[in-house]
């Protein structure tokens, strides 16, 4: 991710580099989300959004449309790194769309941090990046182990 990029470039004192060196796995958050019946699938973003969402979609026999403008980008980073970088220890989950607002409010109340809805699950079998409501042809992939 962006923190590793900073470290490799010799920028060791940036907030992104510090976050990379001192990850905070979201165990309590994962346990809480995993107990919610409106949450359908979940995993950490160790290999990046593009790769890890692909794993969820493959196992779920589903597709997704991801709104590029809704992906959170850390200060000092960029959209491609946010979508393809890994080792973030954040959680990626899918939930019932009719429960999303209530789930986000309950998460914020419990953990003091927001949930970022970035798209929707579709009946198709592909990941489609969207910009301004239109498909954006991007060949973005996260980390692959082999």
Regions found by a protein language model. Give the residues of each.
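Short, acidic (Asp/Glu-rich) active-site segment that either coordinates a divalent metal cofactor
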Residues: 1-32
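Glycine-/charge-enriched secondary-structure boundary and capping motifs
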Residues: 12-15, 35-146
């Amino acid at each position: 991710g962006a923190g590793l990029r900073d470290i490799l470039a010799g920028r060791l004192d940036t907030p992104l580099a510090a976050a990379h060196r001192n990850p905070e796995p979201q165990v309590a958050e994962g346990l809480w989300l995993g107990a919610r019946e409106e949450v359908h699938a979940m995993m950490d973003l160790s290999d990046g959004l593009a790769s890890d969402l692909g794993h969820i979609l493959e196992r779920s026999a589903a597709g997704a449309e991801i709104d590029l403008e809704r992906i959170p980008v850390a200060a000092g980073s960029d959209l491609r790194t946010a979508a393809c970088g890994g080792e973030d220890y954040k959680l990626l989950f899918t939930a019932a769309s009719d429960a999303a607002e209530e789930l986000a409010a309950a998460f914020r109340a419990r953990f003091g941090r927001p949930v970022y809805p970035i798209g929707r699950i579709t009946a198709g079998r592909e990941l489609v990046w969207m910009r301004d409501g239109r498909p954006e042809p991007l060949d973005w992939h996260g980390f692959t182990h082999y």
